[in-house]
Amino acid sequence: MAYEYNEEWVPQTRLGKLVFDGQVTSMDEAMDSGLPIRESKIVDLLLPELEDEVLDINMVQRMTDSGRRVKFRATVIVGNGDGFVGLGQAKDVQVGPAIRKAIDNAKINITRIKRGCGSWECGCGLPHTVPSEVNGKAGSVTVVLKPAPRGLGLAAGGTARKVLEKAGVKDVWTRTEGQTRTTLNFAKATYNALMNTGTVRRPIVFDETEA
């Protein structure tokens, strides 16, 4: 079924046209298509329950020939609390436009993470934690996520907790290294760790019959 109520959006990409025409009706289908998401409206239509949260607003300055230029840099996390999460940042001379641009960038950067019950202490089989230990790095910050039993909660710092909540991870152990006071790198490292949940390598099982 095509999206008849969205006359203002004129899709510019192949995936956007497929979504607009109703040929792609879920974010899973969009991800499985192999086509890049380059329009934030795609995410608006496929994940209407998506929530966003501003992680950081910072003022940045740059000297030019005409003098000092000041802009605001916004860092935003978006997620549906059920396996989809995106991180974005943007700059503008005003805070409001910077936030809106960062939200759009976060939607374009949305990714599907893999969840499971990877803790040997649990075994419930529900997708409440990460499937195995993963790590992410950004700048000087390294974040390690470890599977935790159901009911433990998020043993994570403020910025990492917000990213994990938006991704739909309910229980996890974390370990951090580096300057975690830098919100941007802390958020990026956590986000990168979550992205790595989909690229976990399984251990090689040797056939004992081969000798």
From Swiss-Prot:
UniProt keyword annotations, A-Z: Ribonucleoprotein, Ribosomal protein, RNA-binding, rRNA-binding
Molecular functions (GO terms): rRNA binding; structural constituent of ribosome
Chain ranges passing through the membrane: none
SUPFAM superfamilies assigned to the protein according to its UniProt record, in alphabetical order: dsRNA-binding domain-like, Ribosomal protein S5 domain 2-like
KW RNA-binding (keyword) present: yes
Gene3D superfamilies hit by this protein: 3.30.160.20, 3.30.230.10
UniProt keyword Lyase present: no
Family named by the database record: Belongs to the universal ribosomal protein uS5 family.
Domain description: The N-terminal domain interacts with the head of the 30S subunit; the C-terminal domain interacts with the body and contacts protein S4. The interaction surface between S4 and S5 is involved in control of translational fidelity.
Protein's name according to its UniProt entry: Small ribosomal subunit protein uS5
Species of origin: Methanococcoides burtonii (strain DSM 6242 / NBRC 107633 / OCM 468 / ACE-M)
